[in-house]
């Protein structure tokens, strides 16, 4: 079925390219359909795009127009989000379910059309309704218009998409988590959809991802984390990396033997095949919090780097394995991210030195009473449901309308309010270890309600946000993703943020530009940005369970003074919720 489907609807790629570097049009058709896949002795029905797992790579050049036709042949509604694409004045195409649009119904089609402006590097795309992004995802590569990189040009670039293999139906997984059940786990990590040969069932060894290389040549690995639950450590035995980019922006080259990538992040690394020709294992290992956090299985996938000219049994030699950190050691992730800085180049943007609005966001966890009850037995009883919060508010996601439509039409009543708190309701010691186990100290800080509270900004406002992890989260880090923007990551630190002490750590010279900010376990991150892109922009943690639990909000950015600084009306291909 898949083969005939792809023959008739095959990915239509129209690249009207560029003589003399002119922008073109890149056009694809994404057919979303069911497919049976067998792993670990069991056959699972999954949802994919064009018969591929991961899905097709969208490969464009800076300045191109992208047109994607999505055909929904699965029994569930879905949207496609272009993760990290700035969507300048094209918020209608962002693809955030119930934020910018209602889902594409089963049997229907939708076209996304947008420009790619002032971005170069690796982004990605994924489904943005329920848990479908586990298998509906792929790389989104933006190449420089002049074909020149600020680092040695690789002979080849290779997406390395790290994910998870779930046997549980993903729509059922979403339902279970919304009901407060967080006991389900994937069976394995994956590299480019392969579980790897460390996984087996009844003697049947799973297939590994294989990267074929030639000695002396360099390769650009585009490492993307699509997983629900974990950061990942990624290494190749006998090789080092030079980190050159992240989230569609260049970085100051940084040498390391290991990459750490959080859910939502995309990290670009150069790898030179300079080891003695042989086979070398690559490992993706999930980094998971230590006790007393709930302990989950070890997720790992093993792939292979294979040099040309080496026979299938590695000339009779053992295949080297990389030495990995302890899976519960979170500090390598902190140090990796802290060592990254933005690359100074002619087009780099400068940090706003003046701040118009300062926001302090505490990332927390707690319980509320189930149903419409206002009182209930606490201490994680069956009368409560666990929620995640930002400044003590757990976000209620709409499920019948889209926030962008309501904002554009001027009809927010009964759907959202614009009173998202810009600071926590009560200060406390946010990283007090005594708050980790549930108990009376934690209970007085817990939220009491869910709501759809948004924050509105005037156009061209300079905003500073301090994200603070709390021990109410136990030991989770938090990859916070802001749609529609790149933000300057000024600093990260451990412990509770202290302005007098920590502002001196801010990097105003060459900070990273990121769309996904990893707020470290028991620590904080400081960002700044200018609200120069009007629309409705979703802000959320990229751990799937935190999204479902309510660690989210949306920013409304008003129109500027001119048509060129304003959100245009919905394009002809946009389908309103009542017409979906």
Curated annotation (Swiss-Prot):
Report the EC number(s), separated by commas if there are several.
1.10.3.2
Q: Which residues bind Cu cation 2?
A: 83, 126, 542
Task: Report residue spans for region: Disordered.
Answer: 560-580
Which positions make up the signal peptide? Answer: 1-23
Q: What compartments host this protein?
A: Secreted, Extracellular space, Apoplast
Q: State what this protein does.
A: Lignin degradation and detoxification of lignin-derived products.
Specify the protein name: Laccase-20
Q: What is the species of this protein?
A: Oryza sativa subsp. japonica
